[in-house]
């Protein structure tokens, strides 16, 4: 095993969460190493950005680079219910984009390098502990094992949930939305709406947990996803191709119409049990950000936005912890902030799936419309005193009580 280096912060994973955490830590004068197992660019879903994510990108000074990369503007989200009924439109209040994640994530990685984040391609194998505190990691690179020491180890490994698998963070627990499988692929030649709505996200649903996304990720390429319950997938489908075909036939005729002359690019893929949470996700010398501790139903595209926001907020907690030699107060504050925002988003999504028609009505309610639009734009962590989250929570609690009685 080689000699080890020491850093203030070691980050596992260089997706949006890891890159933003690294950038913000470097701005605060901390030394940062990011260890990434995959060679970039690499494929990833999560291609539609909220308005909140768009603002973070502008704050990074990347707006011109986003436009130069050909990422389409995202005017809004069109939600279409069964048989094209129950349709409503969600405008985007802050400019943002649809993205090809391989290029977008690579852009964030380059920005992190510009800020002085050091990178190492390698596979993290284990953590190093001393007197119960996490003090580093062991990783494999170039067929050798290496040690690196850290004041804080950050798990930004996404759905690999590294620290959970190693027994450092809590166990991965299923969420309400977990019993689904998403199948997805990219296509050229998809029929789009007329400008200025041609680059909207389109969500089509037939009934609870049966839905599809269509996301324009470049001037000539669209992402199609079909999401169905796991038991239906295993009953009707042998592979992701079958699931996509099933969705075209059964979720909405609009999918077939738009894709009748389209050509698929590359293979289709699938992902199961994608909704989970992990508790605890902070501890002595470590914390988790983004998908490494929680992932919700992706219907409203919160994933990248929440990952970036948590990366930024975690950097604040890390700086406070190191400066004050306090490994509890700042990390617990980050935990509580994260849980609060994530729960508001989870309530909103559950409310939509339980009361989809009434959710559309709430979009037209003058007392709630602005709040709902802002929540859908990613402002779930900054909504103290708003009416909408309380309405959603009360309705869900009443629904759950009736389910227990009935």
Swiss-Prot record:
Reaction(s) the record says it catalyses: (1H-pyrrole-2-carbonyl)-[peptidyl-carrier protein] + 3 bromide + 3 FADH2 + 3 O2 = (3,4,5-tribromo-1H-pyrrole-2-carbonyl)-[peptidyl-carrier protein] + 3 FAD + 6 H2O; (1H-pyrrole-2-carbonyl)-[peptidyl-carrier protein] + bromide + FADH2 + O2 = (5-bromo-1H-pyrrole-2-carbonyl)-[peptidyl-carrier protein] + FAD + 2 H2O; (5-bromo-1H-pyrrole-2-carbonyl)-[peptidyl-carrier protein] + bromide + FADH2 + O2 = (4,5-dibromo-1H-pyrrole-2-carbonyl)-[peptidyl-carrier protein] + FAD + 2 H2O; (4,5-dibromo-1H-pyrrole-2-carbonyl)-[peptidyl-carrier protein] + bromide + FADH2 + O2 = (3,4,5-tribromo-1H-pyrrole-2-carbonyl)-[peptidyl-carrier protein] + FAD + 2 H2O
Pfam families listed in its UniProt record: FAD_binding_3
Residues binding FAD, per UniProt: 17, 36, 42, 44-45, 48, 101, 124, 291, 304
EC annotation from Swiss-Prot or TrEMBL: 1.14.19.57
Repeat among keywords: no
One GO molecular-function entry: oxidoreductase activity
The keyword NAD is assigned to this record: no
Swiss-Prot/TrEMBL keywords: FAD, Flavoprotein, Oxidoreductase
Disruption phenotype: Deletion of the gene abolishes the production of several bromopyrroles.
Highest taxon of the lineage: Bacteria
Function: Brominase involved in the biosynthesis of polybrominated aromatic organic compounds. Catalyzes three successive rounds of bromination of pyrrolyl-S-Bmp1 to produce mono-, di- and tribromopyrrolyl-S-Bmp1.
Record family assignment: Belongs to the flavin-dependent halogenase family.
Protein name: 1H-pyrrole-2-carbonyl-[peptidyl-carrier protein] brominase
Organism: Pseudoalteromonas luteoviolacea (strain 2ta16)
